[in-house]
């Protein structure tokens, strides 16, 4: 018997809703990355997008352990000399709380065309409101 290989026609994605209130950043990000990948399904195939859509709400209430609130820093570079920009966790959470979870999950996805396709299935919102009620996402507890 041949090994089963999923393809785009045989995979049917679901919409899942995750409430991030009080959850730890890294643990939540790794579970969401696995769901985006489709690793929780029996028909998981490494080179196929078999994952589900994930809507995350309340990311402004994420937890982080230790002193990382002040010590953890995020860097990006403009490409010009002296263009390194640095911001710590507390400041980034005040300005763009959804960016923290985006960066954590994006680092856990494959680098390449498949990873970019999976990343587009992730929807993150700071409050408890989201515009995806029409898709009827089912609430899961991670």
From Swiss-Prot:
Matching entries from Gene3D superfamilies are given as: Ribosomal protein L13
Q: Which InterPro entries match?
A: Ribosomal_uL13, Ribosomal_uL13_bac-type, Ribosomal_uL13_CS, Ribosomal_uL13_sf
Which terms does the UniProt entry file under GO BP? negative regulation of translation; translation
Its Gene Ontology cellular component terms are: cytosolic large ribosomal subunit
Q: Which domain of life is it from?
A: Bacteria
Q: What terms describe the molecular function in GO for this protein?
A: mRNA binding; structural constituent of ribosome
Q: What does this protein do?
A: This protein is one of the early assembly proteins of the 50S ribosomal subunit, although it is not seen to bind rRNA by itself. It is important during the early stages of 50S assembly.
Q: What is this protein called?
A: Large ribosomal subunit protein uL13
According to its UniProt entry, this protein's organism is Coxiella burnetii (strain CbuG_Q212)
This chain is encoded by the gene named: rplM
């Amino acid at each position: 018997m041949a090994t089963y290989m999923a393809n785009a026609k045989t995979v049917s994605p679901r919409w899942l809703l995750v409430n991030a209130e009080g959850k730890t950043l890294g643990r939540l990000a790794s579970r969401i990355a696995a769901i985006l990948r489709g690793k929780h399904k029996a028909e998981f195939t490494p080179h196929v997008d078999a994952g589900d859509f994930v809507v995350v709400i309340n990311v402004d209430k994420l937890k982080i352990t230790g002193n990382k609130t002040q010590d953890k820093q995020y860097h990006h570079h403009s490409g010009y000399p002296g263009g390194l920009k640095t911001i710590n966790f507390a400041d980034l959470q005040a300005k763009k709380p959804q960016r923290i979870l985006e960066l954590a999950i994006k680092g856990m996805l494959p680098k390449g065309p498949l990873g970019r396709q999976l990343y587009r299935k992730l929807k993150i919102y700071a409050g408890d409101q989201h515009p995806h009620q029409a898709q009827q996402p089912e609430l899961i507890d991670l």
